[in-house]
UniProtKB/Swiss-Prot annotation:
Cofactor details (free text): May bind 1 zinc ion per subunit.
Residues given in the record as Zn(2+) binding sites: 896, 898, 907-908
Main localization of the protein described in the UniProt heading: membrane
Homology family: Belongs to the SecA family.
The protein's required cofactors: Zn(2+)
InterPro entries noted in UniProt: Helicase_ATP-bd (IPR014001), Helicase_C-like (IPR001650), P-loop_NTPase (IPR027417), SEC_C_motif (IPR004027), SecA (IPR000185), SecA_CS (IPR020937), SecA_DEAD (IPR011115), SecA_motor_DEAD (IPR014018)
Subcellular location: Cell inner membrane; Cytoplasm
Species whose genome carries this gene: Xanthomonas campestris pv. campestris (strain 8004)
The name this protein goes by in its record: Protein translocase subunit SecA
Gene: secA
Entries under Pfam families matching the protein: P-loop_SecA, SEC-C, SecA_DEAD, SecA_PP_bind, SecA_SW
Composition bias, Basic residues: 902-912
Assembly and interaction partners: Monomer and homodimer. Part of the essential Sec protein translocation apparatus which comprises SecA, SecYEG and auxiliary proteins SecDF-YajC and YidC.
Amino acid sequence: MINSLLTRVFGSRNERQLRQLNRLVTQINALEPTIEKLSDAELQAKTPEFKQRLAAGESLDKILPEAFAVCREASRRVLGMRHYDVQLIGGMVLHLGKIAEMRTGEGKTLVATLPVYLNALEGQGVHVVTVNDYLARRDAAQMGKLYNWLGLSVGVVYPGMPHSDKHAAYAADITYGTNNEFGFDYLRDNMALSRADRYQRKLHYAIVDEVDSILIDEARTPLIISGPADESPELYIRVNRIVPQLTKQESEEGEGDYWIDEKGKQVHLSEAGMGHAEELLLQAGILENADDGLYAAQNLSVVHHLNAALRAHAIYQRDVDYIVRDGEVVIVDEFTGRTLSGRRWSDGLHQAVEAKEGVPVQRENQTLASITFQNLFRMYKKLSGMTGTADTEAYEFQSIYGLEVVVIPTNRPTVRKDHPDQVFLNRKGKFNAVLADIEDCAKRGQPVLVGTTSIETSEMLSEHLRKAGVKHEVLNAKQHEREATIVANAGQPGAVTIATNMAGRGTDIVLGGSLEAEYHVLGEDATEEARFKIKTDWQRRHDAVKAAGGLHIIGTERHESRRIDNQLRGRAGRQGDPGSSRFYLSLEDNLMRIFASDWVQKAMRMMGMKEDDVIEDRLVSRQIEKAQRKVEAHNFDIRKNLLDFDDVNNDQRKVIYAQRDDLLDAESVKDNVDGIRGDVIYDLVARFVPPNSVDEQWDLQGLEATLESELGMPLALRELAKTQEELDAEQIAAKVQTAVDAHFAEKEAAVGADTMRALEKHVMLTVLDQGWKEHLAKMDYLRQGIYLRGYAQKQPKQEYKKEAFELFSEMLENVKREVINLLARVRIRSEEEVAELEEQERRQAEARLLASQFQHQDAGGYGADEEVEQMQGGNAPVPVSQVTRDEPKVGRNDPCPCGSGKKYKHCHGQLS
C-alpha cells in the first residue's frame, strides 16, 4: 500500500528516469539551432574536436548533449532522418548501459547511431550485435554512410570472410556482426597460435539489437567450436534399427518400453524397456555378453547411443525441429524459424537424427572451445540492448546481466486492437476459423500476417489457402533467402503472409508496401516524375489499407513465452497506424496439452463443445497466461542452472586464456620453463624417493627407468648409491636436478639460445592447447552425469565444482610434465626447423578450424531439467553473483580465480 502511494506521488522508477533524461533532451534541442548553422566541414570537424576533449580528460557524459546534437544534424543531412525526442531518450538509455524497450517501428536502428557515435569517439571499438547476417550487413551499409561522413570507420564481420578483411573490420571504430560471429571469433582468437592471427581487441562496448532474443532465448545454448572425434559413426546406424522395435508408454506408469518427458525434452526407459532393449541389442550383436547388462561399465557407450536414438525418434520432428536439405540434417531455430546451416546438436543427437533420416552420418564432435552468451557478453566493459519486448524479462536481465530495462514511450499513441483469444476443442476447428479469418481479410483488402510455430503448420496452411485460391507468401526456414522482400510486401492491400515464429524481425511491415523498396527498384537515375507516380500509387494503397483496419495479426498457437507472442502482435500498429491481432488456440496445442490446467480441458468437454464451437473468455486467457508464466519460470531455472555450471568452466577458461595471452605476448618463456622443470623433477623424484625417507623405501630402478623413458636421460643412480654410503633422498633429488639442468643446457648450446627460446614457446602453447581440449572432453562427461549425484543426497553443483577443480589441477600438472618431457626429448637442429614446425602447426590449426563445427549445444546436456526438478526447494538458494564487466589481469599474489583460496602463484598461476 505504501509503495503504491509513493508511486502515485513520485511516479514509478521508469517515469522518474524518463523525467531526468528529458532534461538532457531539452539541452540537446537548445543546441539544435546553433548546430544547424554549421557548414558540412564545420560539422564534420566536431568529431576530431570531441576526441581531443576526451583525450584532455572530459567525460563522455559531459560531451553527450553536443555529440547527440551533432549526430542528429548529420543524420538529417546524410540519411534524411531526424531523431525524435523519444529516440534521443532511447540513445541515452543505451549509453548508460541499460536496455531500451521500444515498440516495433520506433526506429531502433536510428536510435543506436547516437550512443554508437558517442562511444566510438573513445577509439576502443563499439560492437553492434544483430540477430542475423542480413541485418548486420544492411545496418552497416545504411548507417555506415552517417558514420563515415562523421569521420568514423565501419566494419562488418560475417562467416567465411577473408582474414585480412576481418582484421580490418575489428580494427574499425564501429563493427557490426551477429552474436554468434562475435562469440566464435572470441573463441577462435583464444585458439590462435600467434598475436597476428587474432582479430578482436578488448571487449569495450556492445549494443545488442533484439536483446531479448540473444541474451535470453539463445542463452540456453552455449557456443561450441568442435572437431570430429575418432569414433566411427557405424554404431548410430546399428542402434537406429533397434529403436522402432521399442514401444512408447502413454504415461510414466503405463505399459511400454519408454516414456517421454516433454517438459525436459528427455526420454526414459522403463524397467521392462531396459530388458527389451538389452534383448534386442544382444540379438543385433551390439552387446556381446548377456551377463553384463546394459549399464555395465563397458556398455556405457551403447547407452549413450541408445539415449540419443530414442530422443531423435520420440522428440525431434522433421519440419519442426529440423529439415533435410541436400542430404543433410539442418537445425531449425525454435525462436526465429530460421535454419542454422553448419550448426550441429552435440552429445550424439545430430548423428542419431542423421541415422533416423537415412542420410550420411558424420562423426561425433569433440569440443575444442566453448562459451555461453551470458559469460561472453558479461566480459564487455559496458553492455546495452534494445528490443520491443523486454519488460516481462526485466528480473532476469537485472539478476544475470546487471541490466536495467527502461520502457521508452512511443512517438505516437498505439491504436492497435488486441482481440481476446478464441479457444477450440481441437486443431481442426481452430484452423477452420483461421482460414475463415484469412479469407475475410483478403476479400476486404486488409493485409494479414499469420504467425505459426513450425514449418509443418505453415506449409499445411499454405496448402489450404492454395486450394481456396487465396494468393499468399510463406516465410519460413526454407524461404529465408527471400525474407526481406516478403516482409517488405506484407503490408500490400489484401496481402497474406504466413511466417514461422518471428522470422523477418528487423524489417518493418509498412502499410501499403515498402516505398523505399520501390524507389530502390527505380534506381538513383529515376526522374522526379517517375518517383512522384510511385509515391502517389503508394499513398493510395496506404490509405486503402488504413481504411481496411491496418495490418491484422493472426497467431495460430501461443508460444511458451509471452514475449514471443507480444513480438508477433507488435508487428501491427507501428507509429500510430491502425492494426489488430487475435490468437486461435486448441486443447491439442503443446502449451495447452502440457502446461495448462486440467480443469480447462475438462470444463470444455463437460460443456459438450463441438469441433467448431469457440470460447472467448478472460478466465481461460488468464489460465493460458498462467501456463506461460510456469514455462517462463521453468526456462529461467534452466538458464540460471546453465550459468551456474558454466561459471565453473568460465573461471578455468579465464585462467587458461590469460596464460595463453602471456605466452603469446612473451619474448621469452625461459624463466617459466626453468620454474616448471624444477617442480616436475621434484615431483618425479618424490614418487620414487620420498623426501626424508630411508633407502629401504627408495625405488631407484623405477626412477632410472622413468628418467630414460620420459626424459631420454640414462642416469646410473643405483651405482651412485652403492659408491656413496651417506647418500640421502635430498641429495638424490639434487643430483637428478643438476643432471637435467645440464641436459637442457647442452641442448641449448647445441641449437643456440634463439632456437631454444622459440621451441620453448611453441611447445608450451601446443601442449597447453591439447591439455585444455582433453580437459573440456572430461568436463563434458562429468557434466552429463553429475545430476545423478542428487539421488545420493549430494548437491550436484557443489560436486561438479569440486571435481572440476580436481580435474583442472590434474590437467595443469599433466601440461607441465608434458612440456618438460617434450623439451627434453625433442631433437631440433636449427631455428628454421622451429619456424617450419610452427608454420606446420598453424596450417594444421587452420585445417582443424575449417573442419570444425560451430554449434549451439542442447542445454539438456547440462542435466539442467533433471536437476532443476530435483532441486526445487531442496537446495539452499544460490546467491546471484555480482556482474563484473571488466576483467583485470590476475596478480601473482591475488587469490586464484578458481576458488581454491590459494594465491594465484601457488595454484593455477604455477604454469605462468
